[in-house]
Amino acid sequence: FSLAAKIYGLKTVDESFANSSNNITRFYVMSKNENKDFDPDKTYISSFLFSVNNTPGSLFKVMGGFATNNVNMIKLESYNYGADFVITQFYCEIEGHPGQENTKFALNDMYHYCSKVRKLGVFEKSTYRSRQ
């Protein structure tokens, strides 16, 4: 039974929908200022949005920059937008902090091949992910 449904008096549609020990809900905390200085004793995840240049192989080259610099990409989602949905934007999460040398090099490659890059944030990697 959903706790949220109980609190707000809502009808539960399916009681077994999320009954897996691996299910998680993620919440994002937004700030105008960066708040995660690099600590070499911690593991980080960085998230960003980017659009590649409209040239053959641009996405491949962005991905290659992460691979070459030994940066693990853990999530990549694509979204089409624009009047005719011809522009593709990607949401990406990587293991790493922009203060780490290898991540810095990978991001420099990324800026070279992308028409737009927007850093969304950096957060400490949850111990939950380490169990996966």
What residue ranges belong to the model's regions?
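Domain-level signature for soluble enzymes in the chorismate/prephenate branch of the shikimate pathway
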Residues: F1-Q132
